Amino acid sequence: MTLPGRPTGMARPRGAGPCSPGLERAPRRSVGELRLLFEARCAAVAAAAAAGEPRARGAKRRGGQVPNGLPRAAPAPVIPQLTVTSEEDVTPASPGPPDQEGNWLPAAGSHLQQPRRLSTSSLSSTGSSSLLEDSEDDLLSDSESRSRGNVQLETSEDVGQKSHWQKIRTMVNLPVMSPFRKRYSWVQLAGHTGSFKAAGTSGLILKRSSEPEHYCLVRLMADVLRGCVPAFHGIVERDGESYLQLQDLLDGFDGPCVLDCKMGVRTYLEEELTKARERPKLRKDMYKKMLAVDPEAPTEEEHAQRAVTKPRYMQWREGISSSTTLGFRIEGIKKADGSCSTDFKTTRSREQVTRVFEEFMQGDAEVLRRYLNRLQQIRDTLEISDFFRRHEVIGSSLLFVHDHCHRAGVWLIDFGKTTPLPDGQILDHRRPWEEGNREDGYLLGLDNLIGILASLAER
């Protein structure tokens, strides 16, 4: 049957779907309005069941008579169970993923709207606060975030009755806050848990503030690198702590794949080496990590102490990875299916790194092209940036994000160990590091990264 006012044929307009952001949404409603809507639906279903009213047109009918000819007893009231699924809200706060033609979206005020999808996740699926093991030097973390407005009304008859479950699913196009659901907005690929919180505003995330990172973000917003980093929207207070209000880089992606690439030939500051020599602090946890990778790595003295210093561990870690050879290393990957991996500690050669990127992109030539263009854009911007020229960039990462709709983006993140140089000093970022020259090898790593992706594009 054709409903009045509804066109025949396909119900969805041509091109509509998760990758077509042009559909209009229903008006936004508050959580209170949603609750009232739900309660009204509960009351209506219960009243209909109590009155013995027939099911809605189109529902599967059961026999109205039992074998002995007596009328079938009215079923017990059916109470819907509310399930709010958690998807990504897609209103970027600043430069977001590129559009389908590869153009980068404009800054604040732009909107990338996508149709919502039903999901099988529920309020009881709270998830974990940490996806992967903590890293000793990175601060990328997960967070709770604003939920998408996907609602399922699941109605079930009394469990004592021998009947099938009936599910009534409705999709409500309005964003709601779900305090019971955690969305991995900033994926915990490598870092300390608890660094991030939900901002309560679409497209934003809160990161625990540190003086060095706050200093850097303020200056980056006035530098040519502004479009290459998460947009910074000031400091807010939550639970007695200060948080940086940042752009949620995963906003606007549908089932994103994420890769964290630690840049530079070292991830420790020169002053850390100095302090370690003056007041060496032994770390048993880092000794255990070293032992797990290579039992022969610790010296006899370290075996006896069953501990190593942090700089010693980090120098060893960089030596077994591609940091010292290529100027970057892969910290972790999250795929669209939610599976994560940080097993890249010994990924050292160019060939090994190339295979990892190839698997990460799964042969998507368009994503590869966009990644390559974005990296070249970032390199061009870094080379003219006054901020970059006058800062030692340590422990910072490039965050790669793409989805099945061929959206792809790369951003510089994590500036907690980025420090200004003395007046008059500038860095080349490609020269070999020697203690005292403060070179970080950032551009050396970026050159190699671009070369690896370019070689994949030529295949």
UniProtKB/Swiss-Prot annotation:
Highest taxon in the source lineage: Eukaryota
Function of the molecule: Catalyzes the phosphorylation of 1D-myo-inositol 1,4,5-trisphosphate (InsP3) into 1D-myo-inositol 1,3,4,5-tetrakisphosphate and participates to the regulation of calcium homeostasis.
Residues bound to ATP: S195, K207, Q247, D248, L249, D260, K334, D414
Pfam families: IPK (PF03770)
Phosphoserine modifications at: S135, S195
Regulation: Activated by calcium/calmodulin.
Organism: Mus musculus
InterPro entries according to UniProt: IPK, IPK_sf
Subcellular location: Cytoplasm, Cytoskeleton
Catalytic activity entry: 1D-myo-inositol 1,4,5-trisphosphate + ATP = 1D-myo-inositol 1,3,4,5-tetrakisphosphate + ADP + H(+)
Family that this chain belongs to: Belongs to the inositol phosphokinase (IPK) family.
Assigned EC number: 2.7.1.127
An individual GO BP term: actin cytoskeleton organization
Keyword Phosphoprotein: yes
Residues annotated for substrate binding in this entry: K262, R283, K310, P311, R312, Y313, M314, Q315, W316, R317, K417
SUPFAM superfamilies xrefs: SAICAR synthase-like (SSF56104)
Protein name: Inositol-trisphosphate 3-kinase A
Modified residues (Omega-N-methylarginine): R35, R55, R62
Disordered: annotated span: 1-29, 49-164
GO cellular component: cytoplasm; cytoskeleton; dendritic spine; glutamatergic synapse; postsynaptic actin cytoskeleton
Residue span of region Calmodulin-binding: 285-293
Primary location recorded for the protein, binned into one broad class: cytoplasm
Lineage, opening ranks: Eukaryota, Metazoa, Chordata, Craniata, Vertebrata
Keyword Phosphoprotein: yes
Keyword tags: ATP-binding, Calmodulin-binding, Cytoplasm, Cytoskeleton, Kinase, Methylation, Nucleotide-binding, Phosphoprotein, Transferase
